[in-house]
Every structure is written in C-alpha cells, then in structure tokens.
C-alpha cells in the first residue's frame, strides 16, 4: 500500500471502483459474495483513505483545498506557488495524479504521448467520452470540467 494507490488494499480498491462506477452496495456484495455490511465498512474505509490521500497530496504540494470528493476521486484546489487552479485525481488506473491548469505547448512537449495516454485512461475509467485526435491540453479541459461538474 502506498500513497499512489490511496493506501488501499486491492479488495478496497475494487469495492471503491465498483461504487464509483455506480453499482449499489447490495450489487457489489452479491458480486463479491460478501455481506452488505462488509461492503459498507470497506467503502467507509476506502473513502476515508482516499480523502486522506488527496488531502496529503495537496498538503505536500502546498495546494489550498477548495473542493474534495473521495467517492468520485478528486480534489480541486489552488496552487499559490504556480498561481493556478489545480486538480488532484485518484483512479484505479493512474493512482494519484496532480494536474495544474496552464496553457500547454503540447506539440513541442516530450511527454505528449504519456500525457495523452494518461488523460484517455482517466476519461475511460470515468466513462467520459473525449473526441479523437485532440492535444492533451484540450483533453484535460474537457475531462476536468466533466470530473468537477464544470462547464466545457
């Protein structure tokens, strides 16, 4: 268990992901062949660990917390150091990721492919459709608006 996976056990991560995808606790319990109480307890623990992981990541990076949602796996904040909005996400595929709002020069960036793959994986895991052949900066705008409930 590490910060990058929210200090969750594999079972807690699975249960949290099922709930994040919209499955009811009773359905998760049936699928995993355990009691609803077991699922309820595991979800409470998972949400607390994710909340603590998101807040710890914000604290380490000196990000002022504005909104946090452990069930959906995100923290919205502001970086005084970079003077920009910041989004910290938690997902089963990417773990903890920090995203700073900025005007990217994606075409000239060495990490273009890596950023694009990470953003597409984040969107796929959250059932958010993105257009094809966009730059990572465009994906990020659309994805983060969808995650935080903003407009884009």
Where in this protein do the model-derived segments appear?
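Short, Lys/Arg-enriched anionic-surface-contact patches
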Residues: 1-10
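Short alpha-helical "packing" element that flanks the helix-turn-helix/winged-helix DNA-binding module
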Residues: 11-19
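Residue-level signal for the short linker/turn that defines the boundary of a DNA-recognition helix
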Residues: 22-24
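Helix-turn-helix DNA-binding helix
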Residues: 39-40, 46
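Helix-turn-helix/homeodomain-like alpha-helical modules used for DNA recognition
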Residues: 63-136
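Low-complexity intrinsically disordered segments
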Residues: 130-152
